[in-house]
Structure formats: structure tokens, C-alpha cells
Amino acid sequence: MKQKTLKGSFSLFGKGLHTGLNLTVTFNPAPENSGYKIQRIDLEGQPIIDAVAENVVDTQRGTVLGKGEARVSTVEHGLSALYAMGIDNCMIHVNGPEFPILDGSAIQYVDKIKEIGIEEQNAPKDFYIIRKKIEVKDENTGSCITILPDEDFSITAMCSFESKFISSQFATLDNPQNYDKEIASARTFVFVRDIEPLLQANLIKGGDLDNAIVIYERQTTQERLDMLADMLHVEHRDATDLGYIQHKPLQWDNECTRHKLLDIIGDMALIGKPIKGRIVATRPGHTINNKFARQMRKEIRKHEVQAPIYDPNEEPVMDVNRIRELLPHRYPMQLVDKVISLGATTIVGVKNITANEPFFQGHFPQEPVMPGVLQIEAMAQCGGLLVLNTLEEPERWSTYFMKIDDVKFRQKVVPGDTLLFKVELLAPVRHGISSMKGYIFVGDHVVAEATFTAQIVKNK
């Protein structure tokens, strides 16, 4: 699967939720491996903020990104749409300190993405695959986010609002392809009891019933409710009439929790990589979401290169006989047993290391260790299979080493190990020359890596 960006640019206009300013945000295509970036085009020097979890400077009333003096708030809805729609790279321009709130959901972003289109890029999509349970908790609030291994990406959110009118809810997104229909149009919400402190803090200047669900669930005095109505420029309401205050009816009974799930995805976008795993979030909010995103980035840095998933029960893409048809190597120099994954730019091969390998007789009799040069040779044979896969009549071609760089051996390879080779093309093959980066894994650990250049020659 390849990385994706937008086919073109689109803009959205509206009021900022907290500032009340008229704002424009423009989403633009971006190069491979650039991720999400936000540029304050209204400031001197037009600073660019990388949209990553470490750059979050506030989570009290939304996610605020910052770099130096530059700040951008209310970014989560736009980022949620990008992430859920599979966009990997995007440059975002905004002419003020926050994104426009629009209707309080992500649906307008989704509609614009569909309208402008999505473009596939050349670089492979770099998923982070969850291999073990990761959990982040906030003991003070009881919030918790857990991610578990799964072949796909899904989220379940469970919320408890400490309200008699709206108590416990849950929402689930089992397939990101359903995001536009099940999640994107869920609107942000606020309790009447929280509005006065926000107004006193000089916030929600752009808030109204067109961009939020307002929940009146604790009776207050008529005088106080009238005062809040005047401040928000809405009609007065009977103080004994509890319920939802809005221009549009609820789309789902659990719309509030669906919006919480939307926010989780927006804050997950700050991890910087698409994830394969199942998330269960209890009492989510921007603070715990950001704490989770930061922890995920730490995990990714620990395992910058992930081992491929290997299921010995699955049929190989190439068995040893097919490999023998493509490569000239024979025992004892055919060092790839099978290929389990083969794409346009990436290959994954397997070799089982046994005690009766002939090189162990001399390397070393008392402490058998696979020679590093043979590890590189095995990795290069995988690379040869990858390059040959791009050619017509691959049996008529051979590959030859030209250069090896940046070789690192990190761990001994011994009898009983199963080697997984992962080799990626660094650039398209040009004039018969290919550049590749290869890794060897034992379990989850990188045991060796190298960059190499090879020449392909038609000689049969």
C-alpha cells in the first residue's frame, strides 16, 4: 500500500470557535514522508508547525499546536478527516490562530477531500503494527486508552458524562471506510454549566447553536439562563425545560460519544503514522488522547523499523523451487528458503538457521555464529528477487553487487534462529542500476542492516 496526498488544494471558511474571527484554512498536497504540517500564513515568517504530539501545548478546550510564539487551535476535526480518509501527507495553511469551527464536525472536510480527490504516491505507507498491549491512564480522571494487536484499525469509545440527562454511552468504528457515514458528521457538544466559565475566560466567541450541541441537564435560575442566552445571542428558554438546545435534531442517540471518537482520531493523527491495532478508550478527552499519542511516538522510536509479521501456516509467495528458477545460486549458497511477501518496492524473505549449516563447521566449532558476510549475501539475494520481479522474463536476468554501505551487525545469528529479510527499493530501477535498503530480523529485533547497489544484466 502506498502513501497518499490530495490531488489538489481546497479551502474552507468560517468563524473560529474561541476567537470569533473569520478564518480560512487551506489543505494542500505535500511530498512523500512529509506528514501533516500547519503554516500560519498570517504571521511574519509564516512559521510551520509539525503536527506531532510533542508540539501540543494545550488540551484544555481542544488541541492546540505550537512552535515558538505561533499557536494553532481547534485542529482536531480537520486532522481527524485527513487521518480517517487515509491521507498521509498534507500542508495546511491557516490565516489565524485556529481552524474555523464550521458546523462543529468533520463532515465538510470529508466532503472536500472527496471532491478534490486523493492521489497515490510512490513511497510505501509506513504502518506501525501493534504487537503488544499498550495502555495509558490518568488516575485523576479515570481516563484510559488501551491499544491491542489487530490486523486492522478500529476504535471503541466509552463515555460517562456524570449527568442524569446523558450518562453512559459508547460508540465504535470498526472500519475507517465507514468514517464518513458513521462519525464525520457528529458535532461537538457543551454543557450549559460549562458555558459561563468559558465565556468568562474570553473563549467560545464564535460558538452558537449552528456549530455545537448544547446540553441543559442541571436546572439553574431563570435569570442566569436568560443571561447566558443573551451572551450567546439565542432565544430565552424556560429554566425548568431540561434537554438538548439545538437548531438541528440529534443524528444518533450517541452523537456526543461519536464526536469523542472523532476527536480521538484527530489526536491520533499526531502520532505521525497510520496504526494497525484496536483502540478501547474510556472517558476520552484531549488530555488523555495527547498522552496516548506521545506514548505511541515513544514506542515507535524504540522500534523505528518493525519486523514483518510472519505466519508459518500461510502459503509462501515463492517457495524454494521458484527461487531456484530465478536465482543462479545453489546449495550451499542459496540462502533464501521462501518469500512470504512481494510488492512493487518491498520483499520479505525467510531463512531458517539450523545447526547443520556447512559454515558452522569452521565458524566457529565451539560457538556457531552465522558469518556476517553471508547475512548480507542472503539479504542481497532477497533484493535480487525483488528487482527481478519488476522485469519481463526474469529468468533471463542476473543481479550483481556494485556497492555496499552502512552495514551494521547488531546481534549474533545462531542455530535455531529464523531470519526475516525485509528489503525495500530506495528508488526506481534506472539504467539497470537499483539501490536498496535491507534489514534482517530475528523475532522483533534487527540483527543486521545494509544499503546496497546492484546491477541487473540480461545474460541468458
Which ranges hold each PLM region?
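Residues located in well-ordered beta-strands
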Residues: L335-K338, K403, K408, K422-E424, ...
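Hydrophobic beta-strand-centered segment that forms part of the acyl-chain substrate-binding groove
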Residues: G272-A281, P308-V317, G383-L420, V447, ...
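Flexible glycine-rich active-site/ligand-binding loops centered on an Asp-His dyad
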Residues: A171-F189, M370, I440-A448, F452-K460
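C-terminal regulatory domains involved in ligand/effector binding and gene-expression control
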Residues: M1-D88, H93-Y310
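Non-catalytic linker/capping segments at the edges of enzyme domains
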Residues: K302-V369, R396-S398, V413-V414, L426-P428, ...
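Beta-strand-rich interaction surfaces with strong enrichment in secreted/lumenal proteins
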Residues: L12-F13, Q366-E367, K408-K412
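Active-site helix/loop of acyl-thioester processing domains in fatty-acid/polyketide metabolism
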Residues: R258-I271, V339, T345, V369-P394
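Short Pro/Gly-enriched beta-strand edge/turn motifs at strand-loop
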Residues: T5-S9, V317-I323, L420-F421
